[in-house]
C-alpha cells in the first residue's frame, strides 16, 4: 500500500515522507518487524516502544511513527498520539472494516467472558450471520479459534 493511503488521518499534514513509498505491513513489536513495514513505536507501561526504533530500522522498517523524536537517523514521522495513529493506519490497511460491522463492547469486573459468549451465540442464532469475539481467553472469527494475545 502506498504510504499516502496508509498514513491518511494518522500523520500530521505537512509531515515529511515519500507519499509513493510502498509499505508492506504494520508492526508495533520490534521483534516482528519485516523489511518494508511501518513500525509504530507505542509508549508502554513497562518498556517504551521508542527504545526499539533502532532495532526496527535495522530489521528493515521503511518508516516509523513515534510521539517524540528518536535518537539517530532514520525515516520517522512525529505524531501526537501513537495509539491513535496505529488505529488510523490499521483501519486504512484493512479497508475500514468497522464501517461494515456492528461492534458491541462488554466491560465490567466479572462475567465478561460468559456474557460475550452468550451474546455471540444469541446473535448467530437470531441473525443467521457469523459473529466474531475478541476475548481474554481466545478470539473467535467465524469457526476459527485463535489464542488471545496481549489481552
Regions found by a protein language model. Give the residues of each.
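N-terminal leader/targeting and accessory segments in enzymes
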Residues: 1-88
